[in-house]
From Swiss-Prot:
GO terms for cellular component: plasma membrane; proton-transporting ATP synthase complex. Pfam families: OSCP (PF00213). Belongs to the ATPase delta chain family. F(1)F(0) ATP synthase produces ATP from ADP in the presence of a proton or sodium gradient. F-type ATPases consist of two structural domains, F(1) containing the extramembraneous catalytic core and F(0) containing the membrane proton channel, linked together by a central stalk and a peripheral stalk. During catalysis, ATP synthesis in the catalytic domain of F(1) is coupled via a rotary mechanism of the central stalk subunits to proton translocation. It is found in: Cell membrane. Transmembrane segments: none annotated. Gene3D superfamilies: N-terminal domain of the delta subunit of the F1F0-ATP synthase. It comes from the Bacteria. This is ATP synthase subunit delta. F-type ATPases have 2 components, F(1) - the catalytic core - and F(0) - the membrane proton channel. F(1) has five subunits: alpha(3), beta(3), gamma(1), delta(1), epsilon(1). F(0) has three main subunits: a(1), b(2) and c(10-14). The alpha and beta chains form an alternating ring which encloses part of the gamma chain. F(1) is attached to F(0) by a central stalk formed by the gamma and epsilon chains, while a peripheral stalk is formed by the delta and b chains. It is a peripheral membrane protein. Keywords: ATP synthesis, Cell membrane, CF(1), Hydrogen ion transport, Ion transport, Membrane, Transport.
Length: 178
């Protein structure tokens, strides 16, 4: 079975538990931290999937590493470990955050700009484009890309809004050639 499908099922179960116990904000913060641990430490995942290390030692490692996280998340990680699915943690985190964002009416967006955007500029982008997407707000991550020359390129889901100078130059070039 596809990792994305499996991760979505676990994420949905964790989301339901978080909603019932009113731990949504806390679990979102914790799952982002867990995701970061797995993303930044390839050897950690290798250790958890190492066949010669006993399951009990792997469980102890999870309990020790994630002692500060709430029990629903820690128990989910232990369950994934027991079922040999610990490698889906990044996908599970992504799916969980997507579910939380959908429930809140928030969309994740990436803004590419020639210089870092101020909080006011991010807020203005969020206000304008959230309405276009039918959301209440956008959570914007800013990536500086000097090749854009100026302006902003905004990616929301699978949509790209290109208001960069380099994008405009490319469109003009296509019109002149074609």
């Amino acid at each position: 079975m596809n990792k994305e499908i499996i991760a979505k099922r676990y994420a949905l179960a964790l989301f339901q538990i978080a909603t019932e116990k009113q731990l949504l904000d806390q679990l979102e913060e914790e799952i982002r931290a867990v995701w970061q641990v797995f993303a930044e430490n390839d050897k950690f995942l290798s250790l958890l999937t190492y066949p010669k290390l006993s399951l009990e030692k792997k469980k102890a490692l999870i309990k020790e590493t994630f002692a500060a996280v709430s029990s629903p998340l820690r128990n989910t990680l232990l369950l994934l470990l027991e079922r040999h699915r610990i490698d889906i943690v990044p996908q599970l985190a992504e799916q969980f955050i997507h579910l939380v964002n959908e429930a809140r009416g928030v969309a994740e967006a990436t803004a590419y700009s020639a210089r870092p955007l101020t909080e006011e500029e991010k807020r203005a982008l969020s206000d304008v484009f959230a309405k276009k997407m039918g959301k209440t707000t956008l959570h914007i991550e800013n990536i500086v890309d000097p090749s854009l020359i100026g302006g902003v390129k905004l990616r929301i889901g699978n949509r790209i809004y290109d208001g960069s100078i380099s994008g405009k130059l490319e469109r003009i070039q296509r019109q002149l050639i074609g």
